Amino acid sequence: MTKVGLRIDVDTLRGTREGVPRLLATLHRHGVQASFFFSVGPDNMGRHLWRLIRPRFLWKMLRSNAASLYGWDILLAGTAWPGKNIGNANAGIIRETATYHETGLHAWDHHAWQTHSGHWSIRQLKEDIARGITALEAIIGKPVTCSAAAGWRADGRVVRAKESFNLRYNSDCRGTTLFRPLLMPGQTGTPQIPVTLPTWDEVIGPAVQAQSFNTWIISRMLQDKGTPVYTIHAEVEGIVHQPLFEDLLVRARDAGITFCPLGELLPASPESLPLGQIVRGHIPGREGWLGCQQAASAS
């Protein structure tokens, strides 16, 4: 049996309103639990449109047929009008999710984090994280114990900024296996659970066709030599590709794969995890930098 952590990112108002309820129903039908990470502030995702001038981002949008995949309400959100507050508008849905699944913070403002966190000061990072955690805790009525940086935009500064929030774990980077981030010699931070597998929008296109994606990703899960963690998005697998995701759950079960919340991947003694650090890097299919796992020594 292969255990795969299932992470569900919720980036937008529509993803929360439409995608999450469908995913909750789908997961319930198949007896699967996952980790949901919510954006709870303004939905300004449409402001990413200016990135179309960047060839890699434009190619990604064309390759994934973004208008069909996400819908124009997502692609234009927060452009000609102020972005609506996701958490306030969907508190009931978020509370229901937290009743049945591990629930953590993705971002206060997903667009702002993805665009500006790379040059924010530690103080600004802490303020933004605190704003998101406070809002999410007010909605779900219990402490937030985990987080996942929007767009995997994280580095050593983000790791340090999150230390004051006493989280059980963070999932801020791409990598191969769980690790303890080294803050300074002799001092480690909150365990990191990296995403190890590609997302739909990173690979779909000439190399991998939509109809063969499930077969392809299951093969990658079975071949993963680390701690497999897979990310889906409420805006994709919860809406236009919900049937594809349901088919994935069936095929994965038949292949001996069990999905679980990320928290279940943590060992009883996190001190046994290897040391590592998060550095800025790049991966195929994703425009811009993102946090990547790198080995570190204790010295």
Curated annotation (Swiss-Prot):
It catalyses: 4-deoxy-4-formamido-alpha-L-arabinopyranosyl di-trans,octa-cis-undecaprenyl phosphate + H2O = 4-amino-4-deoxy-alpha-L-arabinopyranosyl di-trans,octa-cis-undecaprenyl phosphate + formate. One of its GO terms (biological process) is lipid A biosynthetic process. Residues 2-260 form the NodB homology domain. Pathway: Glycolipid biosynthesis; 4-amino-4-deoxy-alpha-L-arabinose undecaprenyl phosphate biosynthesis; 4-amino-4-deoxy-alpha-L-arabinose undecaprenyl phosphate from UDP-4-deoxy-4-formamido-beta-L-arabinose and undecaprenyl phosphate: step 2/2; Bacterial outer membrane biogenesis; lipopolysaccharide biosynthesis. It comes from the Bacteria. GO terms for molecular function: hydrolase activity, acting on carbon-nitrogen (but not peptide) bonds, in linear amides. GO terms for cellular component: membrane. Keywords: Antibiotic resistance, Hydrolase, Lipid A biosynthesis, Lipid biosynthesis, Lipid metabolism, Lipopolysaccharide biosynthesis. Its EC number is 3.5.1.n3. NCBIfam families: PRK15394.1. Belongs to the polysaccharide deacetylase family. ArnD deformylase subfamily. Catalyzes the deformylation of 4-deoxy-4-formamido-L-arabinose-phosphoundecaprenol to 4-amino-4-deoxy-L-arabinose-phosphoundecaprenol. The modified arabinose is attached to lipid A and is required for resistance to polymyxin and cationic antimicrobial peptides. HAMAP family: ArnD. This is Probable 4-deoxy-4-formamido-L-arabinose-phosphoundecaprenol deformylase ArnD. It comes from Salmonella choleraesuis (strain SC-B67). The gene is arnD.
